[in-house]
Every structure is written in C-alpha cells, then in structure tokens.
Amino acid sequence: MDWNAIQGILPHRYPFLLVDRVLEVEAGRRAVGQKNVSGNEWYFSGHFPGQPVMPGVLIMEALAQVGAVALLSLPEFQGRLALFGGMDRVRFRRQVVPGDVLRLETEIIKLKGRVGKGYGRAFVGEELAAEGELLFAVGEKIE
C-alpha cells in the first residue's frame, strides 16, 4: 500500500503522516509498515542540532498509525477515526537517525467493541529500535 492509499485510510497528513508504505495488512489483526527517515524531517532541526535523532514518541506514533491501518481495514471500522489512547511498557533500544529505514510492526492483541490494545515493534534492519503497548479507541465516522 503506497502513501496515497494510506491517506485513503488515515486522516493524517504532512507533516504528521509518519508511514511511507504499508507492506502487509491482516485486517483487525496486524500490519507492517515502513518509514524512510530522511535528513529533511521537520523534527531534526531541533532534536538535536548537529546530532539528529528521531524522537521516540514519534516512533510510537508511527507504530500507532500502522496499527490504525490494520484496525480501520475492518469493514465495520472503515471511514472511522482511530484514536491513540496511550502507551505502556515502552522501551527505546536504539537511536533512529537520518538514512535509517524503520520497519514498523503492530499487532492488535485485544479488541473489545471499539476499544483495544496493540503491541508495536520498530526495527532498523534486524535491530529492535523501540517497542511497547499501544492503547486505542475507534471514534465516529469521519465526514
């Protein structure tokens, strides 16, 4: 799924759409996405000048966006908004810097009605960069 198709599912737009491609989707179960981390990312000018590092919370947001693609691919949730409700047990294992390609893997581990939990892992190559639980709710239809 390319960037245009992702925008057909998620309402996020530049500069806050943090997923460039979705490589795999199992509706309601899991998705795998990719973020090509460019030296031109808006956040690098201040995080940190001279030693750019992708903020960990934005890695988690990217994982949440990939999870939202899996969730909103279910027929009953199409056209709705996925709301990021929180994070638990988050760990940052490796810095993500310009030139890295992030592989974003998010699994939906619990779904009850329109509320649930996912688990996300972000990799650079085979190296784990970040992981944690993602809490979410599915909102109303987007008009």
Curated annotation (Swiss-Prot):
Molecular functions (GO terms): (3R)-hydroxyacyl-[acyl-carrier-protein] dehydratase activity
GO cellular component: cytoplasm; membrane
One BP annotation, GO: fatty acid biosynthetic process
Keywords: Cytoplasm, Lipid A biosynthesis, Lipid biosynthesis, Lipid metabolism, Lyase
Family that this chain belongs to: Belongs to the thioester dehydratase family. FabZ subfamily.
NCBIfam families: fabZ, PRK00006.1
Protein name listed in UniProt: 3-hydroxyacyl-[acyl-carrier-protein] dehydratase FabZ
Organism: Moorella thermoacetica (strain ATCC 39073 / JCM 9320)
Lineage per the UniProt record: Bacteria, Bacillati, Bacillota, Clostridia, Moorellales
